[in-house]
């Protein structure tokens, strides 16, 4: 199927300077869509970000990037003011993508000292059989685990030293509230804002990103997990209440993907190793594969997909 969008069709991507957001911006731009990216990055980071934006500029119908706080009233007003002028000739937002990764990764409970390094005894026995020091073996395993390919890391996962966590602070109510809004319910805020401005296309898509943390408890992920569950609930409500206006809302659950956002999560190396070992294809999901699917959801042929969570993980979630 050949995919071709009109330059009057816009993608508004929240969190579009890296990861899924950037990959999606590049993908839909290559197929002719105009792109608006909202991101928040330090000036020093822009040197690494601009080449990706240049790729989009080279093929998008039109492109604009806003480096500001997408969660503030002022930020939304700036974006909507600019887009209202740009789209005055008839352009409309075909796809609004929520890919904001701004959450608190503190522990919910203190670590139990008795629940520690499950692989320590195995490493000691292996070191003894090999005739090397346990510390030397641990360092070698850690090096291969962190720097080897996905298959090697997956095989060594059970022997690797456990992740380290910041135990100096724990999650508080305000941490939950901020994370749930930034990574969850702010989706509703943006949909309402774009809708009230009359900028949605007659046939539009609202897409957002979730993870298996919506069902599986991961240490240090409690606030983000709560946000993802809220996001999915909000998306279902959008799917029902905005359907009469031609807006379809879905959530994409990507497999474990090596990204800057993932690497911020304590224990991310262990998550990647376990995912690569479990995935039927023996590797991680890529941001580009997820972007390919999101692009498909923007086509006319996907108009009847509404109100669901769609896994894009190569079978990772269902593999035993």
Predicted regions mapped to residue ranges:
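Conserved glycine-rich Rossmann-like NAD(P)H-binding loop of the short-chain dehydrogenase/reductase
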Residues: 32-50
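A glycine/serine/threonine-rich, flexible loop-to-helix segment
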Residues: 48, 223, 244, 254-279, ...
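Conserved SDR Rossmann-fold cofactor-binding beta-strand/turn motif
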Residues: 248-258, 298, 311-313
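Catalytic loop of short-chain dehydrogenase/reductase
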Residues: 101-230, 235-244, 256-257
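Hydrophobic structural elements of the Rossmann-like NAD(P)H-binding subdomain
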Residues: 97, 207, 249-252, 262, ...
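Canonical Rossmann dinucleotide-binding motif of NAD(H)/NADP(H)-dependent dehydrogenases/reductases
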Residues: 2-38
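Rossmann-fold cofactor-recognition segment
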Residues: 56-74
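Short C-terminal tail/terminal secondary-structure segment
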Residues: 216, 281, 293-295, 306-320
